[in-house]
């Protein structure tokens, strides 16, 4: 399916939740229970609570994840084998899901299923910036603090230390602002998503890329057991506040 001719003015919004079955670090990661809810269900509920997302679908290669998604009331599109291995790209899986859904939406919101903690308005902020600026894509970023590269060093096999950057001491307020993608949300124009170019893995972001800022810790991307523990604590605390 190709992008509609009016892709820049078509502001209908489709969210694609990505959830692979395989995970080397945490087996069944996207289906694991966290704060009483399957991991991927947190993202589905986040998307369904958005004021601007009109439809939510899930792309997966796992039957367990598919069952969870359907129990949350969303459509599921099973990935073919070639889009389910470690070398498959996120954008290729999203294109497959968009095509399979037959959605005419001009804006696609990409959400990772292993991110159970996000600010409630994050997707709406990204969509608003995309629409207001006419950009090709908007991604969420946090400002790098203690892991700023100007404070980093190299450590070789003998234990010898060399500074990564310029050999000087930086105070925190002297560090140039740098930002890291946090995995919270990507909003992209359909035309950009389907503009594929071999050898350019970031081509689908388009030429006009924008960002929205989050605070470090606002978004929790689950890769390890420690990430799970942090996210669980945050989600339980939120539940207690609203109880």
Regions picked out by a protein language model, each given a short descriptive name:
Residues 92, 96, 116-205, 213:
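Conserved core of the sugar-phosphate nucleotidyltransferase
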Residues 53, 103-105, 134-135:
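Short, high-confidence coil segments that cap the C-terminus of an alpha-helix
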